[in-house]
């Protein structure tokens, strides 16, 4: 659910319902494109980019594929004409664990051989560059492989990682 539209990920596409009508995925007319019409937009990348997760971040929607991250943006309102998807970073992710936000950052898992790392995605305040720092660099063997769930608490400044493997 994003900006009063119900959305789905379908391979490389993001599909949104009509504005305010969550179960309508067909345009009102075929001769004109209305601002309230459904949206069906694809990511464009040199690698195969099957979308795995979508997470709200700041005023946009972050889209996660196996080897790249994208940002879905729209000026003012989300319409078929104003929607754009741009590549922000290119990190390999753990596909089973949905990224979580805490404060001004977004966290996601990355495979590291027999272990898993956690990246902290944020937009740099002065340069507006997108980057993801490895917040587990000081303990690279702490989280075992098989990450399937991330949970966050901004009150406790904590990220919880659940894995299928034992430590």
Predicted regions and their residues:
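Acidic/polar low-complexity surface segments
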Residues: 22-38
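Short conserved active-site loop signatures built around small residues
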Residues: 6
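Beta-sheet-dominated scaffold domains
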Residues: 13, 19-20, 42-167
